Amino acid sequence: LAIISRRRMMCEMTPLFARIAVGVLAVAVACPTTVSAEPTHLMVRAQSVDAKFMGTHTGGVAVTVTDERSGKVLAKGMIKGGTGDTERIMEKAHARWQVISDAETAGYDASLDIEAPTLVRVDARGPMGASAAAITVSSTLWMLPGRNVLGDGLVLTFPGLIITPATTRNPDGTLRIDAQVTMMCGCPITPGGIWDAKDYTVTGYVLDHGHVVATATMHYAGQPSQFTFGDLKIARNRLSVRLVASSNLTPNVGVVETDIGN
């Protein structure tokens, strides 16, 4: 009789356990576990063509990372830091896979919240401290959740030269034109240096309402990155000067215009 009673009790309890199990399953379905996006890191760097990394010295580089397909902004920030080790970057041969940046080298560590393989677009604009020289360089690449791109990371190369112009009226009425010309990273141009002054051409064009009325081939002025032309005869005030600097060996070119003071 005792055995029969226990069997009867188990049979009566079974529907109760079944109802509890169904209830738990319903709660689980209604409240699924939330899976957050996994932070994935992308190091972005900007390097001047034939030179070093761009960073704080020239005002930094603004970076925006977007989902190429949806247009959603995934990260925004600034490339800041130093220009890197000159010997490692410019003077020594690089082996394949060799990292040429170091802990002090300018970069932006973009943290991306992605849940699936994502095609991202990286737009970088700079140097922000030299607006006339600033350009935008872009690239797209696939990023995988949890697969960080670090070390040198994604290196975007920036062709160009930074020109800082100055004009001075001499007492005899002639015009002196000065220009400071550097690489996009701010590195100097000097005779016999890594960026040799003989490999660069700097020309000044005097403009009258957009038309060239005089031309001056500028020469190295004795100080790093300084070029000058000191005795240009012009007949009128309210003119402007266009300065053009170019490398004889690379795509690097810089252009800037400035008004001539009275």
What are these regions, as identified by a protein language model?
Residues 110, 131-141, 252-261:
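Edge beta-strands of extracellular beta-sandwich domains
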Residues 142-187, 262:
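Short, compositionally biased P/S/T/A/G/V-rich stretches that sit at domain boundaries
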Residues 19-30:
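Bacterial N-terminal signal peptides
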Residues 115-117, 124-135, 246-253:
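Short acidic/polar inter-strand loop motif in beta-rich domains
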